[in-house]
Regions:
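Chalcogenol-based redox active-site neighborhoods
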Residues: 1-160
């Protein structure tokens, strides 16, 4: 089984990417540079309990993230059709990106070996990155536990 790459380092440039999004347009990290911070959250799968709770948590506080000057962007390996259903059903006001070949997940070090019902598989380990307006990693939340996570990220963005 392939080995996972390491997480990026706080203070270093975030790996750039361009991925298809639920807007119908491609989204790249560089389009936010100089304009907004980015909350880039990687999650395993649309419509699973933890992923739904996390997405809805970001949805519920999205106006506060916007007020803090941050864009929320979700990434998983699900296909566009699944993302669109998930976004519509839960009224998510932010884009979901399709990382079908896991290249971006690997670049961010979140594509990991997992044990699913006794079967070894590769998948996304729930992780959130805060990327500042200069395109550098400002904070990393690895192995995210959903409960309280969204509030923790917002607190980081709004602390003095």
């Amino acid at each position: 089984m392939p080995t996972a790459t390491l997480l990026p380092v706080i203070g270093k440039p975030a790996p750039d990417f361009t991925l298809p999004s639920t807007s119908g347009e491609s989204v790249s990290l560089k389009q936010f540079k100089g304009k907004k911070s980015v909350v880039l959250y990687f999650y395993p799968e649309d419509e699973t309990p933890g992923c739904t709770k996390e997405a809805c948590g970001f949805r519920d506080l999205s106006a506060r993230f916007e007020a803090a000057g941050a864009a929320i962007v979700g990434v998983s390996a699900n296909d566009m059709e699944t993302h669109l259903r998930f976004k519509t059903k839960h009224k998510l006001p932010f884009e979901l990106l399709v990382d079908a070949d896991a290249l971006v997940s690997k670049a961010y070090g979140v594509w990991k070996a997992k044990n699913l019902y006794g079967k070894k598989t590769m998948g996304i380990e729930r992780t959130t990155f805060v990327i500042d307006k200069t395109g550098r990693i400002a904070q990393i939340y690895p192995k995210v536990k959903v409960e309280g996570h969204v509030a923790e990220v917002l607190a980081f963005l709004t602390e003095d």
